[in-house]
Every structure is written in structure tokens, then in C-alpha cells.
Amino acid sequence: MAVLAVGVSACGNDKSNAIPEQLCGVAITPELTAPLLPDGDDVKTEPQSPRKDEYAQCTVSVGGKAALYIVEYSGQNSFDALEHARDASAFRNPQKAKGVTNAVIADGKFIAVTPCGEGKKSHVLDIDMNMPSSEAMDLRDELERFATSYLPVGKKVIGCEK
């Protein structure tokens, strides 16, 4: 195992050692986060609002520069994520995400609208990558893997799942 880690580090592709195992109060595998972040050692999550039962917003930064914006809402009215993405100018090349019924992946952006608890309200997870869309479009699969892994844990932390 140590030989593999040294080999990967020597290639310059292993950023996971600098990435916390929690982002925005949510446990996440660092290997899923690493491809979404620029090179750098000083990875921090900075809450932009206190985590509450209905709203959480934070920024993941590397070297003091914002890299990811993660926003969660619970208790929201449901809406069609793909229709929303097609109407919003922030979504470039939106398409349905795999593995989540009402979710969209776009160049540098992910949004999912899923049931929150047993009520009729919804949880919304909105993730934005802070990079040019020309770079972000090459990371769609990685963003989707990260987001679909973050989603169920984030829903528990915000109170949608027990």
C-alpha cells in the first residue's frame, strides 16, 4: 500500500492527503473530492451560513481561492431539475444525472431535488465548481460521482433522513 501511495504521489496526481474527510459538515471520501479541486495544499471548508435544519451553504477553497460552492435546502417545494436547468443560464449542457431520479449534471454544476423525510417537501442540493466551463466540462463524471455520494449523507446531516 505504501509503495502505491508513493508511486501515485510521484506522479503528482494524489491530492487526497490534503483534503479533509468532511466537507461542509458532511463526511465524504477525499478521493471523490480531489479531481474537483485545483492543485494546492491548504484545503478549507468555510461555512457561508450556519448549518441549520433547513439551509446550509459553504465554500470549499484551496489556497484561499474558492473552488466549490455547496448549498443545501430542505423543506422546499419540488420542481423538475432538468426543466429548471434548461431555463437557467448558469447550466451549460444540462442532462439528467445517473442514479438520482430528479437530478441534473452540467458543465461545472449539479443540482438534485429529492424527497426530504416522509413529508411532501423536498431537499435541494446545488453544487457549483468555480472554474471555467471549458475545464469543468471535462470533469462532469467526477462531479456527478462526488455529488451522488454527498447527497445521501448531506440529507441525513440536514435532517431529511433519520
Predicted regions and their residues:
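Sec-dependent N-terminal signal peptides
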Residues: 1-2
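C-terminal motif of bacterial Sec signal peptides marking the signal peptidase cleavage site
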Residues: 6-10
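A small/polar (G/S/T-enriched), proline-flanked helix-loop surface module common
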Residues: 13-162
